[in-house]
């Protein structure tokens, strides 16, 4: 076999292997993205990510149920949300691409909600989260409770993110009295 034929054969074989590895990698990415969900929601969940520079949504797998998930981010978090709140996440991604973060991003999102540009989170809607560090809460359910207070619902507000808890904390409320009020429920067994 000539050197050119060997080179071409090696190139095409390498390309084929790379495309198979890429497809397998995408399958693994999607499987990990839906892993925070209960088993019966995984197969039909949409999986997407955002272009960090533009905030544009990129669909990795179109689903047919009421939940959508993002692949694990650089910090080790994997999130799944109700589709109802898609516009909210899309706006957040666009604002983040413009350089907003932290409290400034939350303030901008609140202003958009107050102006009617995005709907408030539905009371009782659930967000599923997974985190890849064993000394923290790996699986967490976040129950949205806009404008609720800890006092009216009888909920604790003490954070359960202490590493000494080894990821086995108890539920607690965050951002009470705001439109972003929510209950954090650890699911780590």
Task: Give short role names for the model-derived ranges.
Residues 24-189:
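Primary mode marks residue(s) on the alpha4-beta5-alpha5 output face of response regulator receiver
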Residues 18-20:
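N-terminal signal peptide c-region/cleavage motif recognized by signal peptidases
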Residues 1-9:
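Bacterial N-terminal signal peptides that target proteins for export
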Residues 9-16:
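Bacterial N-terminal signal peptides
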